[in-house]
Structure formats: structure tokens, C-alpha cells
Swiss-Prot record:
This is Recombination protein RecR. Residues 81-176 form the Toprim domain. Signal peptide: none annotated. It comes from the Bacteria. The lineage of its organism: Bacteria, Bacillati, Bacillota, Clostridia, Eubacteriales. GO terms for biological process: DNA recombination; DNA repair. The keyword DNA damage applies. One of its GO terms (molecular function) is zinc ion binding. Keywords: DNA damage, DNA recombination, DNA repair, Metal-binding, Zinc, Zinc-finger.
Amino acid sequence: MEYYAVPIAKLVEEFQKLPGIGHKSAQRLAFHVINLPMEKVQKLSESILEAKQKTRYCSVCSNLTDIDPCPLCSGTSRDKTVICVVQDPRDVVAMERTREFKGLYHVLHGAISPMQGIGPEEIRIKELITRLGSGDVKEVILATNPNVEGEATAMYISKLIKPLGVKATRIAHGIPVGGDLEYADEVTLAKALEGRREI
């Protein structure tokens, strides 16, 4: 039995539906919102509604945007001969934070996972192949996650694009910067050895 008002209990319940938010965190968030001044609560609710209403998928790369095509696709300074394929819009943010990649992106919104009933048709592979039909793209960097689903997706895509004459590369996996070899598992060490480069 909960010891607080029904509207607070409803708010806790809604917060708990968010990923990574358990009961205690949901309770903390609910009480924080209740204690905010009314104008801050209003701003928060307006921001949530605006984000939901105005955000859509870019018609070119499938990234989240409020402008179509997105600024990355319409930017004139990007290298349009290279596309980095990622699973999730958050991966684009991570790649952009490195300030190293200057090409374009393609967001799949998932990975092939037969165990979860997700096949190639359920993610945006067809749209990628359509983009490659223009002939402008010379390389596709497969930056899917380094797990079974990500590897399967990368292999599937590489086989599809090989006949198109587009170079397929895979991001290297291995030891994180500052990590100790003794704590790395065998798979990570093997991937680090595979992905080694000349210095």
C-alpha cells in the first residue's frame, strides 16, 4: 500500500515506465516535480509535448530531427562519399561527440535478432540500399554494436552492398583507453588483436 495521494501514485507509476527507472527513482522524480514551482512544471510538460510532436525521422538518414532533411544530411561540409551505419539515434550523438567522423549517417533503428523476431525487413536496411543506389557513396562504415545481433546485422549488410561496389568496413573493437589487459575478456582481446593497425 502506498502512503501518498493518488495523483502522486499515478505520476510515480508513469515515471516507472521509463527505461532504467525503478520504483525508488520514480518516487524521487515524482516528489521533485511536485515540489517545483508551477511555471517550471509547465515548462517541463511543454518541453515533453513539443519534443514528441515536433521530432520525426529524417527522410534521408532516419535520424531523429525537427527539420527534414536533418542538418547532418543537408550540411555542405559533410563527406557524402562515406556513410556510417548505426543502430540507434543515440549512436549518432556518440559518434558526433568524437568530432572525428565527417561523413553521413544511416540509422537502422535496431539490429537483426531472430530470437526477438526482428528480421532485416523490420529495420531500415532497405532504405540504406536505396541510398547507395545513387553511386555517390564509396564506403559504408558498419558501426553496429559489438554483440551477436550487431555482428549479424553488419555481416548481412556487408553481403548486400558488396555487389554494389561499395567498400564495407567495420569499426574496430577492443580495449578501452585506460583499461588494463588483465581485466579484458578473451573476446575483447581477440577483437583488439584483429583490429590492430600499423604505427
